[in-house]
C-alpha cells in the first residue's frame, strides 16, 4: 500500500528509519549509532522510487526519532565523562597527599546498579528434576519440633487453689501418666522401654495408695507430700505434713464413680483397689478401713506395643493413592485430507437442509388448534366441528367407511348410486330463476364483453373502440355519429317503474338511485350490475354527447347575456363529487370540439367559459328540433341513471 521495496529490504538505507517510526524499542543502541542520518535524509528527499506522501511522513518521523536518540546518548556520554574528569583531575589532587595508603575509598555504585544487576533466570518445567528434588524431602515427624508444653495445666492441676494438696507435682504426673502429646509426635516405644515404664508406675502406685469407698468418705493416704498453701494460714494447718486430705468429687461419683485420679489411671492401666490407709486424726483416733474388694476382677494384662502410637503412614507410597497413569491419546488422522472439486461443488449445491419442515410451536393457541385439527389423520377420524359427546363421536366414526378408488367408476355411475343424496345435486343459478338471456348476438360479442354499468359512470379515459368526441358532427341537427345511427340495439324489456326513473329531466338534472326505489325488481338490480345487459361502448358515446348538450344549453344563456359564464354556476346543481367530475369532463369535451373556450387565471381559481369558434354552429342545439332519427334514438336509447358513490 504505502511500502516500497527498498524500504522493506533489511540492508536498505531506510530500513532502520522505517523501523524507528513504527517500533522504536526494537532498535538497539548500536543500531542507532550505525544509522547515517544525512544519508537517510538524502534518500527521502531524492528517492529512487516514487513514494506516497504518507510513506515520506513515516520516514521523516523515524529520522527525527533516531536523531533524538543519538543526541540523548551523546549527552549522557559527555555528562559521564565530565563527572569522571571532575573527580579524578581536580586541582591539587595526588594519591600521596590526599589519600593514605591504608585508606578505603568509598565508591558510589548507585549509577551502576542497573549495569551489575543480576536477573534470576526463568524457571522452566524442562529443568525440573523430580528425583533430585524429592531426595531432599524429609519426613514430617523428623522436621517437626516436639511440644514441651505441659498439657496437664488444662485440668488445673498446678493451680494452688484448686486442690487439697494431694494432686502431686506436675513432673510426677508427667512421670506417672506421661505428657499429653499428639499421637503423631510421640516416638514409637520399644519393648525394653515399655517394661521400664511399667515398673516405674508400679513403684509409684505402691507409694501413693488410692482407695475408692463411698462418695462421702474421706481418705488419708501416705505418699509424696506437697505443701498445702491453702491451709497453712488457716485452721486445719495442724495436719501432718506427710498426710494429705482428699475429698472425692460427689458429682463424679454420681456419674459413674470415677474421680480425677481414676480418669488418669484408667488411661494407662487398670485401677488398683487393694490399698489400705491407716491414718490418725487430730483427736488421736485410729481408723482401720478394710479395702473394698470387687468379686470379679480380671488381672491386669501387660500393655502391648500396638496400644501406643503407631508408625505414621507414608501417604505417598500407599496403594490407594497411586498416581493415575494417563492414557496416551491416539492420534486420529483423516483418511481423506483433501476435498475434491466435485465433492465441494456437490456440497455447495445441496440445499436439502433448508427444505426440512421447521418444528416450531405455533405463536397462538388458535394456530395450534388449527395445526392439530388440520392433520390428515385428524380429519379422517374427527368431524369438522368440535364434538364433546363421546357417544356421538363414536357413532360418527362408525360411518367412516373407506373404499378403494376405481378409475373406471364414472360420474354417471356415481350419480346413479344410492349414496348420492339429492342434497348434493347442483342447484339452479340465481340468474336462471330470473329468466336472463344467456345467448348473446355474435356481432355484439365480437365487440367485447358486457361492461358493468356501475363502473361505466366512473370511466374517465377513452378506449380505442369508442368514438372520440372531436369527431362528432355538430351539424344542423346535431345527430349522433354514423355508427350509432345504424347500430341495431336489442330491445330490453323494462318495467314501468324503472323506465320512469331512467328518464332524465332536461330542465333540471334529477340524479336518482335505482337501488333506493321500492318498485325496482331483482332483475333490474342484476341488470344494473351487468347481468343480462347487452349495452356496448357505443352507447357511452351517445350518453356523453347528451351530457355535453345539456352543459352547453346551461352555458349558452349566460354567454348570450354577459358574454361569458362561470363553471361554478354549472356545478351548482351537482350533489356530489362524482357529478361535478362528469360535468367537468363534458365541459372539456365541448372545449375540445371548439364549441366553447375555457380560461383559468390561477391554480384552483374560477374557470371562465367563453364562446368558441364553433359556438354558433352548436347553439341551434338548444332550439326545438323536428322529430327525426336523432330524436328517435334519444327516446329509444336507455340511459343508465347516475348513482352516488
Curated annotation (Swiss-Prot):
InterPro entries: NXP1_M-like, Rad21/Rec8-like, Rad21/Rec8_C_eu, Rad21_Rec8_N, ScpA-like_C, WH_DNA-bd_sf. GO terms for cellular component: cohesin complex; cytoplasm; MIS12/MIND type complex; nucleus. Residues 292-311, 495-527, 619-645 are annotated as: Disordered. Pfam families: Rad21_Rec8, Rad21_Rec8_N. Keywords: Cell cycle, Cell division, Chromosome, Cytoplasm, Mitosis, Nucleus. GO terms for molecular function: chromatin binding; damaged DNA binding. The keyword Cell division applies. It is found in: Nucleus; Chromosome; Cytoplasm. One of its GO terms (biological process) is replication-born double-strand break repair via sister chromatid exchange. Disruption phenotype: Postembryonic RNAi-mediated knock-down results in either larval arrest, or adult sterility with a protruding vulva phenotype. Worms have defective chromosome segregation. Its main location: nucleus. Component of the cohesin complex, composed of the smc-1 and smc-3 heterodimer attached via their hinge domain, scc-1 which links them, and scc-3. Interacts with smc-1, smc-3, scc-3 and tim-1. Belongs to the rad21 family. Cleavable component of the cohesin complex involved in chromosome cohesion during cell cycle. The cohesin complex is required for the cohesion of sister chromatids after DNA replication. The cohesin complex apparently forms a large proteinaceous ring within which sister chromatids can be trapped. At metaphase-anaphase transition, this protein is cleaved and dissociates from chromatin, allowing sister chromatids to segregate. This is Sister chromatid cohesion protein 1. It comes from Caenorhabditis elegans.
